[in-house]
Amino acid sequence: MSGKRSYQDDQLDVEEANKRHQMVDTLLRGSEDKDGDNDNSVYDDLLQDPEEVEKENKENRDGDKVGDDEHDVVKGESEGQAAEQSSADQNDENINVDVDPSVTAVARAAQHASQRREAGDEDEDEDEEEEEDEDDHVDIDDVDKDPDAVIDEDDDEEDEDQAQRRRGKKNIEGTGESNDSERATKIGESGSSNETAGADGSGDREDGSQPDGTEHDDEENGGAGAGGAAPRRGRKPGTETGSTAWKQQRKESHKEVERRRRQNINTAIEKLSDLLPVKETSKAAILSRAAEYIQKMKETETANIEKWTLQKLLGEQQVSSLTSANDKLEQELSKAYKNLEELKKKLKEAGIEDPTEEE
């Protein structure tokens, strides 16, 4: 069994070596001029389709198998299995030629070129498929960013807040009603003294204040009123329109306004009396004196303006006359100096001494 097994292994190795040499010879043999450069080089086979090359290799292998009569008939079954195994190995070698060290550099270049073309086609197909997937893809984030959805959530939150406010108001109203019932029972149990105190308290309410007994209860209950609305802290509740307290309040406010107005008038009249030359006591006298004084000041101002205008005109006339007289005197003086110089020259020419120089 061991000798038979080694013989089969040797036969397989021989067949594989022959097939490798045949494949290399097929790649290196002369071929047609596919590039049109009048040169039947080995690189022309690189332009051949890889499928055609594989087909030729299979035909060559089939021819080799038919012409091989040296094998024994007894080992036909094992040879058939070896042929099938060798064909599978040959297909693997045709796909990955660059892995076998017996393949030349030219074969590697041819195989790499075909692999690059196939890889380029596959990449282009994958890119096209990815682009189609991106076109068909719908972004979920864009759907989530819909403004309508956000608005709906805000509306739900606002509705919940409003419902909570309504529940709070109902609770406040319930506490106010319970407090009113407790106050009524306390007032009924109290005697005549409490009734008088209640009457006093009602009078205080008309004036805009609260009784001492109920004020503490209102503070404990959070200031809840009869209608469930709590008044603002630090403020008295408003009085009813048309009541005596309301009328009294309006009367007091009117008096305060009148008092301030009269005070302002008196202050202005006092300042006006200080400006008058004659002091007066009554307001009417002060106002009349002030009117007369102002009228007199206006008349005096008008007279002074006329007087000052006339004086200005007269002064301008006098200035102009003096200016002209001064100009004439200057001209005469210059002429006199010229005549004097001429006389001096004539005296010198006549041999007479100048009497002005001796003096």
UniProtKB/Swiss-Prot annotation:
Q: Where is the composition biased (Acidic residues)?
A: 120-161
GO MF terms listed in the record are: DNA binding; DNA-binding transcription factor activity; protein dimerization activity
Asked whether the UniProt record includes Protein biosynthesis among its keywords, one would answer no
Q: Where in the cell is it found?
A: Nucleus; Chromosome, Centromere
* Record's GO cellular component terms: chromosome, centromeric region; nucleus
Pfam families per the UniProt record, alphabetical? HLH
Give the matching PROSITE patterns. BHLH
UniProt cross-references to InterPro entries, sorted A to Z: bHLH_dom (IPR011598), bHLHzip_scCBP1-like (IPR047206), HLH_DNA-bd_sf (IPR036638)
- Superkingdom of origin organism: Eukaryota
Q: Where is the bHLH domain?
A: 249-297
Chief localisation class = nucleus
Question: What keywords does the record list, in alphabetical order?
Answer: Centromere, Chromosome, DNA-binding, Nucleus
Q: Where is the composition biased (Basic and acidic residues)?
A: 55-78, 249-259
**Region ranges (Disordered):** 1-262
Q: How does this chain assemble?
A: Binds DNA as a dimer.
Give the protein's function. Answer: Required for chromosome stability and methionine prototrophy. It is involved in chromosomal segregation. Binds to a highly conserved DNA sequence (5'-RTCACRTG-3'), called CDEI, found in centromeres and in several promoters.
The record's PANTHER family line, in alphabetical order, gives: CENTROMERE-BINDING PROTEIN 1
Q: What is the protein name stated in its UniProt record?
A: Centromere-binding protein 1
Whose protein is this, by species? Kluyveromyces lactis (strain ATCC 8585 / CBS 2359 / DSM 70799 / NBRC 1267 / NRRL Y-1140 / WM37) (Yeast)
**Gene from which the chain derives:** CBF1
